[in-house]
């Protein structure tokens, strides 16, 4: 099993960061090479939200360099945290992730991210799991931070 964590600081309050993830009703969100399609919105807080994601994977997995995951979001605490569980392919796997927002004051938020990842097949787990997860995760912090900053900027400009 792989375990990947990082955190970063953005110049936005927790409610602003929250709104980037939870305040829109777009059915499809694209950020560079990542595409997220929302299939079900969940309850009023977003608990039970279901999404389908498309993202880059190594070409040697013979999927045209495209990975897919189906994710459901739970343990949603508005302006604080949420969890997701997912099933992904082409290296059939499961992942669990946690995102937590820490208010630093002065209009800044530290975003904490952690994900565990495990391939189902024990042979592929031994041969490919670490390499594939490293590839998938290598730019996650940059993608998430830049998406938040872009979203916050757009919300502020729209005011």
Where are the model-predicted features located?
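Hydrophobic ligand-binding cavity/cleft-lining segments
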Residues: 1-46
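Intrinsic-disorder/low-complexity, polar/charged segments enriched in Ser/Thr/Lys/Arg/Asp/Glu/Gln
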Residues: 1-9, 50, 68, 81, ...
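Hydrophobic/aromatic beta-strand elements that line small-molecule binding cavities or substrate pockets
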Residues: 5-8, 68-75, 86-88, 95-103, ...
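A short, structured loop/turn motif at beta-sheet edges
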Residues: 11-15, 44-46, 74-81, 100-110
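Glycine-rich portal/gate segments that line the openings of hydrophobic small-molecule binding cavities
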Residues: 26-29, 38-90, 142, 146-159
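A short, polar/proline- and glycine-enriched secondary-structure boundary/capping micro-motif
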Residues: 63-64, 92-96, 121-127
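A conserved amphipathic terminal alpha-helix motif
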Residues: 116-159
């Amino acid at each position: 099993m792989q375990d990947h964590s990082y955190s970063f600081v953005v110049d936005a309050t927790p409610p602003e960061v929250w709104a980037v993830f939870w305040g829109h009703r777009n059915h499809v969100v694209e950020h560079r090479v990542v595409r997220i399609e929302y299939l079900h919105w969940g309850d009023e807080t977003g608990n039970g939200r279901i999404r389908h994601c498309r993202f880059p994977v190594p070409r040697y997995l013979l999927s045209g360099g495209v990975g897919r995951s189906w994710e459901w979001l739970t343990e949603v605490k508005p302006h604080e945290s949420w969890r997701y569980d997912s099933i992904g392919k082409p290296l059939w796997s499961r992942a669990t992730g946690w995102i937590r927002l820490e208010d630093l004051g002065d209009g800044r938020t530290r975003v904490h991210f952690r994900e565990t990842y495990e391939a189902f097949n024990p042979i592929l787990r031994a041969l490919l799991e670490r390499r594939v997860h490293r590839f998938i995760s290598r730019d996650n912090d940059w993608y998430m931070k830049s998406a938040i900053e872009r979203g916050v900027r757009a919300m502020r400009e729209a005011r």
